């Protein structure tokens, strides 16, 4: 609608002027993106804003809330799983360290539910690695449980579990730069986790 277009332009102008969004505004924007209310150019503009300035805690929290509210929930809590995550896009052209770590931990008998995506800024996103190893992405809870029981690991391909991440994936890939979605990824595993250490944890 015309009113909606005006609102979206107003939001972008505010961001271009280095103003910050409130938590509820951030949540609404990501919900609208998932519902297809923003076109590719508008999404690219939004991503670019956060390359020009730091994202605020309130904005990040709002985006995270939207992703968690829209997620396809996965209950594997009986396994008390962990996820080992990184933000990706370090520009070092290294192998995918966090995904390799998941194999090691699962091989040692600990239960891992890895949540990841194709690389937007590299060739070795978690989904790229898993696909190369013959993993078939699924949202079927019975198949995920069988994977946990037999291998101590299940893989959640992000676009299958969140419409917003699916909507922005081609734009992120086209831009080829780190964005706030790199920060959000480790925070929005759709499975209820026992714990989620990251490579930067002092532990």
What would you call each of these model-derived segments?
Residues 1-7, 194-203:
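Single conserved hydrophobic/aromatic residue that forms the stacking wall/gate
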Residues 4, 8-93, 108:
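Acidic, glycine/proline-rich low-complexity segments that act as flexible tails and inter-domain linkers
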Residues 47, 95-151:
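A glycine-rich phosphate/pyrophosphate-binding beta-strand-loop-alpha-helix module
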Residues 83-84, 112-116, 137-140, 155-157, ...:
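General beta-strand structural signal in soluble alpha/beta enzymes
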Residues 86-91, 116-122, 161:
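Acidic, glycine-rich active-site loops and adjacent beta-strand->loop/helix elements
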Residues 143-196:
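Phosphate/diphosphate-binding glycine-rich loops and adjacent basic-rich segments that engage nucleotide
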């Amino acid at each position: 609608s015309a009113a909606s277009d005006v609102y979206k332009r107003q939001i972008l102008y505010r961001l271009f002027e280095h103003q910050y969004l409130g938590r509820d505004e951030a949540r609404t924007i990501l919900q609208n993106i998932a519902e297809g209310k923003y076109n590719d150019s508008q999404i690219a503009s939004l991503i670019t804003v956060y390359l020009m300035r730091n994202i605020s805690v309130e904005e990040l929290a709002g985006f995270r809330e939207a992703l968690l509210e829209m997620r396809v929930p996965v209950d594997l809590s009986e396994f008390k799983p962990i996820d080992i995550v990184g933000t990706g896009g370090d520009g070092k052209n290294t192998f995918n360290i966090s995904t390799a770590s998941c194999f090691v931990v699962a091989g040692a008998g600990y239960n891992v539910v890895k949540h990841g995506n194709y690389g937007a800024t590299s060739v070795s996103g978690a989904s790229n690695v898993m696909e190369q190893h013959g993993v078939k992405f699924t949202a079927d809870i019975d198949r995920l449980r069988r994977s946990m029981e037999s291998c101590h690991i299940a893989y959640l391909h992000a676009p299958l579990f969140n419409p917003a991440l699916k909507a922005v994936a081609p734009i992120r890939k086209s831009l080829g730069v780190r964005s706030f979605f790199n920060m959000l990824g480790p925070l929005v595993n759709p499975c209820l986790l026992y714990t989620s250490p990251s490579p930067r944890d002092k532990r």
